[in-house]
A protein has these predicted regions:
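Dinucleotide-binding Rossmann-like beta1-alpha1 core, especially the glycine-rich loop
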Residues: 51-123
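Flavin (primarily FAD) binding-site architecture
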Residues: 260-278
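N-terminal Rossmann-like FAD-binding beta1-loop-alpha1 element of flavoenzymes
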Residues: 4-31
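Conserved flavin/dinucleotide-binding core of flavoenzymes
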Residues: 5, 17, 25, 99-100, ...
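Active-site/ligand-binding neighborhood in enzyme catalytic cores
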Residues: 129-233, 240-243, 261, 271, ...
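Conserved beta-strand-loop-beta-strand element in the redox core of flavoprotein oxidoreductases
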Residues: 238-253
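Short hydrophobic core segments
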Residues: 7-9, 32, 234, 252-266
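Glycine-rich FAD pyrophosphate-binding loop
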Residues: 23-48
């Protein structure tokens, strides 16, 4: 049995950060990861030609100071997401090309409705206390309704409704009917509002990392060194008055405390002895992840740029719901990323890969022309079926969950502590939130031990 000061379960950005900060503080650590790689819900693949592809989380934006601090720590630069040229909105088969945030070529009524709803969402999200959204003045009311119901009652134009539902529900990779309005407002608020949540320039997708997210998580793992143990899915955590014992199939770790830094759906698969408190157990049962495909399509060059397009497009109901330019800072080859979320992701998952590819490429030809039909490579990542992700990219709260069980998100259960982007009060749902949660949990366990030994 390996004996250490602290054990960390999960080597995504939350777990890596927690283990790194503990080790830097002079503590002994064992970091156990179920996969044969680190990164969690981020995953950078480097092709034979040296081009890197982010198959998971990829962007950084304003206010995401903790992931940027890690980038600075390891000397990793970023570059701006490509936004030159026109974006495209496809509604009822008609293409609207536009600059800025809203396609002004749509009817004035639709544009006005979009703007009004955006403004209202921004005002509502400002009322959410980030550390305790369940204490908001209207928490009970908002937690009793779904995002879908709220949009239906507050969006007068069908095109505006469909666009907003696609954009907002996509953030939770689930149908809007599955997501609590309180949770949606909380997640918006944690990032600074709906403009940040959905924005590219100066928003959540403002910049990309040179070399991909792997350029950050690889040196973190290297510094953690032989304290990192891959291919060790944790099956059981026992705690007693003196510490915890964490067990995988062929490894046991004894520690004073453990940080569980895996998605909520995966944390629910671990056996805890004694059982977790009821509220935490019920939280595990009630915060699912969604369905998402992230498909990177590689071309000789980003031909859409020559055609005056940014590569950004959105088409409610389409099997290629959202696209964005994912080319590297080298500008060649061109990479177009297709993101498909929620019910549509589940539906295209029923196709075989060849049919899915034909369907996606046909959609892209309709938007970007015949050149889109002949890629060099087609790389799809289905996070829905990732064994140790449990879906993607964020666990969401259905109605009633935050007001009943929200306080259990961060509350330690004896010697078991929790990390992961869902537990972050700031930037919940982003890589930055994962980093923040790891730093918080590392500080928390060390502080608890100082108090217990004082």
């Amino acid at each position: 049995m390996r004996v250490v000061d602290y054990c960390v379960v999960g080597a995504g950005f939350a777990g890596l950060t927690a283990a790194l900060r503990l080790k830097q503080a002079g503590e002994s650590v064992a970091l156990l990861e179920a996969r044969d790689r680190v990164g969690g819900r981020t995953f950078t693949e480097v092709r034979d030609d040296g081009v890197w592809i982010d198959r998971g989380g990829a962007w950084v934006g304003p206010g995401q100071d903790r992931i940027k601090a890690l980038m600075n720590e390891f000397g990793v630069p970023s570059y701006k997401q490509y936004t030159d040229g026109k974006a495209m909105m496809v509604v009822d088969g008609k293409q609207h090309r536009y600059s800025g945030t809203i396609p002004l070529s749509m009817s004035p009524w639709v544009v006005a409705n979009l703007g009004a709803v955006f403004l209202e969402l921004g005002q509502m999200s400002k009322s959410i206390p980030l550390e305790a959204p369940w204490e908001a003045k209207n928490a009970d009311k908002w937690d009793q309704t779904t995002l879908a119901k709220w949009l239906a009652g507050n969006t007068a134009s069908k095109p505006a409704h469909d666009l907003l539902e696609t954009a907002l529900a996509g953030c939770y990779t689930s149908a809007a009917s599955e997501v609590s309005m309180l949770f949606a407002l909380y997640q918006m608020a944690s990032g600074g509002g709906p403009s940040f949540l959905l924005g590219v320039k100066d928003g959540a997708q403002d910049s990309r990392i040179v070399g991909g997210m792997g350029a950050v998580y690889a040196p973190m793992a290297a510094e953690i060194g032989d304290s990192l143990h891959l291919s060790q899915p944790v099956r059981r955590i026992d705690q007693d008055a003196d510490g915890v014992t964490v067990r995988s199939d062929d490894m046991a770790v004894r520690a004073r405390r453990v940080i569980v830094a895996v998605p909520i759906a995966i944390a629910s698969q671990i056996l805890y002895e004694p059982m977790l408190p009821v509220d935490r157990s019920f939280l595990h049962q009630r915060m699912p992840s969604g369905a998402i495909y992230k498909i990177n399509i590689v071309y000789d060059e980003p031909f859409w740029r020559v055609d005056g397009l940014s590569g950004q497009s959105a088409a409610p109901g389409s099997p290629a719901t959202v696209t964005i330019d994912a080319s590297t800072d080298a500008r060649r080859p061109g990479v177009l990323c297709v993101i498909v979320e929620g019910p549509i992701a589940r539906r295209i998952g029923e196709l075989d890969e060849a049919e899915r590819r034909r369907t996606i490429l046909a959609e892209l030809v309709g938007r970007f022309g015949d050149k889109a039909a002949s890629p060099l490579d087609y790389i799809e990542q289905c996070w829905t079926t990732e064994r140790y992700s449990g879906g993607g990219m964020l666990s969401h709260a259905p109605p009633g969950v935050l007001t009943e069980f929200g306080p259990a998100l961060r509350k330690p259960c004896g010697r078991i502590h929790w990390a992961g982007t869902e537990s972050s009060a700031v930037m919940c749902g982003w890589v930055d939130g994962a980093v923040r949660s790891g730093e918080r949990a590392a500080s928390e366990v060390m502080q608890r031990e100082l108090v217990s030994t004082a």
